[in-house]
């Protein structure tokens, strides 16, 4: 409903309500268009949901998967008979491992692994879709703040998690996929079915390639210079760093959400430290309260965020701190143990409507009835995390099973999730 309300505010009032994987035909002055949305409902998919869009004019079929991660693609074949052009994200925005306090060697190892795993997962989807042409799109992010410029992949760092299109296209070629196309804003590709008629860039081809190769650092520096007034204006609109203590405003915002979210709060399972300049507050999820820290209190998870950012999202009644703060990478974090999916779900569900949806989803997401065999182990077919088909995405190495959809891992000897609290896997040796 968030998107619909925003569109209505812009003047749109004719909407076609649909369901997951249901094809519709829309008629207009230029002819008919078949449309289908593959919907993902999990709180961890985008801001509590994501989707892929399929369009066909009866001759050419395009699947814009963007950064969604569908659990099944059966409807592509059954409804459209295949895909000609596949647009997909291979290098999404995220903050791990860069913002975490950890040894540099560990950060480099995790970054290298994450860089390759993201491209491997995307290649798996490309193989499953089987389109003639693949257009890597929707990423990577570009960091223009001087203090964040090091996050761009422009200095040959194998641990950088934001590879660009040229890097991914080379990965495709290395694995036998020669149908990759490079497009930038303003590029026009003309297709008739699986036939590429033309590909036209807004600037000469050698200049396009230079942006991603020898001239990349200079391009980003020039881009940052052009956008500096825009960034300055945006920051001028932030709330001031100084002001009244933040304890009460955060308490007023968080406590009603905590009281309405048993699954999420119990899933988090411990108090979380929130440092904002000179002030520290504790979000005590087990007790559903926001409070001051106890002397010498230790925490399993903590964040340090500039107070002006917190005051801004509170002032603006922002429902999703993941989108506004965490994805900006303008924060630090520390933790003992693994990633806590429930914690970040809480921060993206700061409205009654959102938290009710997410809590309900977690309450229902426990189907583990089907069983498969993987490398000498019987395991439940659906991943305990987001229900991915482990027959497709599961990889066994020794006594560890990894779901390559999101990179979560389990100890096959115990069924314990090695990535996050909860989410046990039903498994046993064959």
Which positions does each model-derived feature cover?
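Active-site HxH/HxHxD metal-binding segment of metal-dependent hydrolases
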Residues: 1-27, 31, 396-427
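Core dinuclear metal-dependent hydrolase active-site scaffold
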Residues: 18-95, 189-232, 243, 247
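Acidic carboxylate-rich catalytic motifs and surrounding loops in phosphoryl-/glycosyl-chemistry enzymes
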Residues: 19, 138-139, 178-190
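Conserved C-terminal region and hinge/linker of Rieske [2Fe-2S] proteins, especially
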Residues: 35-40, 423-430
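Divalent metal-coordination and catalytic microenvironments
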Residues: 67, 134, 329
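Feature captures hydrophobic
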Residues: 189-382, 389-393, 401
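Cys/His-rich microdomains that often coordinate metals
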Residues: 387-390, 410
């Amino acid at each position: 409903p968030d998107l619909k309300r925003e569109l209505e505010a812009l003047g749109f009032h004719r909407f076609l309500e649909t369901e997951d994987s249901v094809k519709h035909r829309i008629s207009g002055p230029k002819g008919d268009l078949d449309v289908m949305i593959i919907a993902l409902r999990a709180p961890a998919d985008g801001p509590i949901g994501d989707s892929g869009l399929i369009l066909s004019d009866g001759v050419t079929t395009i699947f814009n998967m963007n950064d969604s991660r569908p659990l099944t693609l059966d409807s592509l074949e059954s409804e459209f008979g295949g895909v000609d052009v596949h647009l997909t994200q291979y290098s999404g925005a995220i903050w791990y491992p860069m913002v975490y306090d950890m040894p540099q060697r560990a950060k480099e190892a995790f970054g290298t692994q994450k860089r390759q795993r993201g491209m491997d997962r995307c290649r798996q989807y490309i193989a499953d879709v089987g389109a003639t042409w693949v257009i890597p799109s929707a990423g990577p992010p570009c960091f223009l703040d001087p203090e964040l410029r090091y996050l761009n992949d422009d200095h040959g760092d194998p641990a950088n998690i934001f590879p660009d299109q040229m890097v991914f296209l080379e990965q495709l070629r290395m694995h036998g996929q020669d149908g990759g196309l490079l497009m930038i804003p303003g590029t026009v590709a003309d297709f008739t079915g699986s036939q590429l008629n033309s590909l036209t860039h807004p600037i000469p081809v050698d200049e396009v390639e230079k942006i991603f190769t020898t001239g990349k650092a200079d391009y980003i520096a020039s881009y940052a210079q052009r956008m500096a007034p825009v960034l300055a204006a945006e920051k001028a609109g932030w709330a001031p760093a100084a002001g009244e203590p933040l304890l009460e405003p955060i308490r007023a915002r968080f406590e009603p959400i905590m009281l309405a979210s048993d699954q999420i709060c119990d899933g988090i399972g411990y108090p979380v430290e929130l440092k904002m300049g000179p002030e520290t507050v504790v979000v005590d999820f087990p007790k559903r309260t926001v409070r001051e820290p106890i002397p010498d209190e230790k925490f399993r998870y903590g964040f340090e965020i500039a107070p002006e950012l917190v005051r801004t999202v509170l002032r603006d009644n922002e429902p999703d701190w993941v989108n506004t703060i965490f994805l900006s990478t303008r924060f630090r974090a520390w933790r003992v143990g693994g990633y806590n999916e429930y914690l970040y779900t809480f921060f993206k569900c700061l409205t009654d409507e959102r938290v009710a949806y997410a809590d309900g989803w977690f309450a229902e997401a426990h189907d583990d009835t089907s069983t498969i065999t993987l490398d000498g182990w019987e395991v439940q077919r659906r991943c305990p995390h987001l229900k991915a088909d482990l027959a497709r995405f599961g990889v066994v190495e020794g006594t560890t099973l990894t779901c390559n959809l999101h990179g979560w891992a389990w100890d096959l000897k115990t069924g314990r999730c090695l990535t996050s609290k909860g989410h046990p896997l039903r498994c046993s040796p064959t």
